[in-house]
């Protein structure tokens, strides 16, 4: 799959707009070459057909960029959180490994990716996310509070994106699940 086929014309415009905003928000925290290496990872993931749109047709790269803007602008997180968020799908789908990410971007980024993958796996396995045991397990799995904050930002972004969705039942299910997720466990 070519990257041109993966993005609509409107999504390409949005992608460039989000990219510029993210660069501005991240300021000096991104290291020289981070953006070029990140772009290479994302292109490889797209070209290997490793990531797909979700049930609402949302482009996962756009969704992650929007979430990264929330993470940077509304929460104030910087390099490790932004890169971890943007690269976790590439690691999850096997385009690259956490060890490769650690060598290229550092342990901090790799740690966030491992946390995001573990928490996403936990969410996919547990239908009872509102229980106290689940919240405690989530804290244990996350290990890093930044992972929980990224998950909250992701849920906020999804809820913002689907608010105008025509499929009411799917929208309610996502809102219910996201709402429960937003009740982040506090130690």
Model regions: which residues?
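Active-site helical microenvironments for divalent-metal-assisted chemistry
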Residues: 1-187
């Amino acid at each position: 799959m070519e990257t041109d086929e993966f993005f609509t014309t409107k999504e390409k415009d949005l992608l460039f707009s989000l990219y510029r905003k993210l660069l501005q928000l991240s300021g000096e925290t991104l290291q020289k070459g981070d953006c070029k290496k990140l772009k290479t990872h994302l292109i490889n993931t797209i070209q290997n057909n490793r990531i797909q749109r979700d049930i609402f047709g949302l482009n996962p790269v756009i969704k992650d960029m929007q979430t990264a803007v929330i993470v940077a602008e509304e929460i104030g997180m910087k390099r490790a959180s932004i890169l971890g968020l943007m690269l976790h799908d590439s690691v999850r789908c096997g385009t690259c490994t956490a060890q490769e990410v650690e060598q290229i971007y550092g342990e901090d980024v790799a740690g966030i990716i491992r946390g995001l993958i573990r928490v996403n796996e936990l969410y996919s396995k547990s239908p009872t996310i509102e229980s106290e045991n689940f919240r405690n397990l989530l804290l244990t799995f996350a290990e890093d509070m930044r992972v929980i904050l990224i998950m909250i930002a992701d849920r906020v972004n999804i809820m913002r994106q689907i608010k105008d969705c025509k499929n009411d039942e799917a929208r309610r299910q996502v809102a219910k699940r996201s709402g429960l997720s937003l009740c982040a466990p506090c130690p």
